[in-house]
């Protein structure tokens, strides 16, 4: 990779790839919060584009490396899921495989990050069913198509970006939980049923004031175990419930809608039973306290509380997601 995406190089890249045909003056702004990629918004007359380049070393305190060619996987996933659920993911406008850069449509400026809204007290529980229906549509729509399985039959990004920094790190730092966490990790490695997003959570969803919503960040997409996507989403909701207890009932309604929506579009049992979903959710909660990428919205008190809640869920997953509440 010889090209480095930044606010100076982004407008040049657009011109070289035919995305500024009128040669309009452009404004490039780096969007914050990106751990795994450099993300630049570029706007001007007739131009509204988001550029993304995957990083080989992620922006966290611990050393965390991953192959930047996962950008090519994201492009393929955006195109496929854009066909399954039109208007839900950004449209791909251009792509440079050599330098691992993708250009996609810039979503509306008024759209807000859903996780940020939850942190401000606006839960939007009605969106839970929408999120579940979309995920179920993706899983069901990719579970019986051999061409999709062949295209996304790469597991290295999931190992580098999820199993190693999450499960394996938790096992080292919480040895008393290693057996249970390790069992979940092996389930994720051994089951290959459908296209798994790998990053499906409110932090990767935008919501407009009129209720329209979008999903972004698909660089971890792979053929795998669908329970991961449910658990990943649910882990953020339960983390939020621990962090902001006054929102817990609304968040519980959100979860109920999410699970109902997923069941309605995916079919029965695709992602396993409630016990399995709870165990995997607990693992991913621990990943956000003791893994390589801790959740920034947890304060010290909430982090300690999450450790206790997640350990309890992992010990008795048959009691359900809300047994602690």
Where do the language-model regions lie?
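Helical subdomain adjoining the active site within ATP-dependent kinase catalytic cores
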Residues: 166, 268-325
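Active-site acidic catalytic loop and adjacent metal/ATP-binding pocket
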Residues: 28-51, 183-228
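Short Pro/Gly-enriched beta-strand edge/turn motifs at strand-loop
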Residues: 19-26, 74, 178-190
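Conserved protein kinase catalytic core
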Residues: 58-59, 111, 205, 223-225, ...
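Active-site activation/catalytic loop segments of kinase-like enzymes and analogous catalytic loops
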Residues: 76, 227-267, 281-301
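ATP-binding pocket architecture of kinase catalytic cores
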Residues: 31, 36, 40-147
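Juxta-kinase regulatory segment immediately upstream of eukaryotic protein kinase catalytic domains
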Residues: 1-28
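Active-site catalytic-loop/activation-segment of kinase and kinase-like phosphoryl-transfer enzymes
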Residues: 1-8, 105, 137-187
